């Protein structure tokens, strides 16, 4: 079974079938007809021949910082859903927040002739900037703002500013923050800036915001950081956390210390995932 056979059965040109297989422009009518023929025949294109012909395969590389993360899982599911519409496969690499793995996957995926790479950004380094410059395929970064490549990101600063404003409106004034590392701009810097912005607007000194940085976005780290903040600031009445899972760990530490969450202390995290529904 060849492209020519599919074209003959669908009543279209071989070029139309090729465009369909490669995610190219095509009328919806032709797309439906070709899809039905391929579905009926069980046709699968020869990937090796396709690579020789185009210099790439219908695969997009996705580099993730931690596949166990709820947010990463949601993003990955969305990517797969969109790739399926265009008949692309996903080649997934998990870095576990290891910069060497990140750089390694960028190289390996290019050698595997992927059509492009989606990098869920974590840390911005000179080595990564150079890798972007040298990359031979399109790269898009999610979750961070890197100058060398197109980026898709949330308004981390604005979101945490609004979250903190609501906490301040509830009367909380002794607010502390459990942060990420400075290397991670989105969660380490922009989210903390959002807390400081809200404090400044409320007439408080945002620059003096007490915070502790967690080394991983886990319950264990949230609990450890919360214990540390309770020792340093026992009269705190509000806690903003870098993620919901960190907030869940912080809640465990607050309860162990006899604090009543929602009554004598407010607690909030960023992420809107399952952890945020637990009290």
Regions from the PLM with identified roles:
Residues 32, 43-115, 193-196:
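Amphipathic helical "hinge" segments at domain boundaries
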Residues 96-99, 120-125, 146, 245:
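Short beta->alpha connector loops
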Residues 40-46, 100, 120-122, 223, ...:
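Short gly/ser/thr-rich secondary-structure transition/capping motifs
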Residues 124-135:
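Active-site-adjacent beta->alpha loops and helix N-cap segments on the catalytic face
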Residues 40, 81-86, 110, 134-141, ...:
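Bacterial carbohydrate/catabolite-sensing allosteric modules
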Residues 1-58:
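N-terminal helix-turn-helix DNA-binding module of bacterial transcription factors
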Residues 14-19, 53-68, 174-181:
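Short beta-strand segments enriched in small/hydrophobic residues
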